[in-house]
Protein backbone atom coordinates (compact mmCIF):
# COMPACT_ATOMS: atom_id res chain seq x y z
CA UNK A 1 0.00 0.00 0.00
CA UNK A 2 2.42 2.65 1.24
CA UNK A 3 5.82 3.22 -0.33
CA UNK A 4 8.65 1.19 1.25
CA UNK A 5 11.03 2.90 3.69
CA UNK A 6 8.41 5.01 5.41
CA UNK A 7 8.13 5.13 9.21
CA UNK A 8 5.43 2.98 10.80
CA UNK A 9 3.30 5.98 11.78
CA UNK A 10 3.51 7.42 8.28
CA UNK A 11 2.59 4.04 6.77
CA UNK A 12 -0.54 3.88 8.91
CA UNK A 13 -1.40 7.45 7.94
CA UNK A 14 -0.96 6.61 4.24
CA UNK A 15 -3.26 3.61 4.56
CA UNK A 16 -5.85 5.78 6.31
CA UNK A 17 -5.64 8.29 3.45
CA UNK A 18 -6.16 5.48 0.93
CA UNK A 19 -9.29 4.34 2.78
CA UNK A 20 -10.64 7.90 2.77
CA UNK A 21 -9.83 8.29 -0.93
CA UNK A 22 -11.67 5.05 -1.70
Swiss-Prot record:
Biased composition (Basic and acidic residues): 8-22
Domain of life: Eukaryota
The entry's keywords: Cytoplasm
Described purpose of this protein according to its UniProt entry: Has a role in the physiological regulation of fucosylation processes.
Main localization (coarse): cytoplasm
Protein name: Fuctinin-1
Family: To human SET/PHAPII protein.
This protein's GO CC annotations: cytoplasm
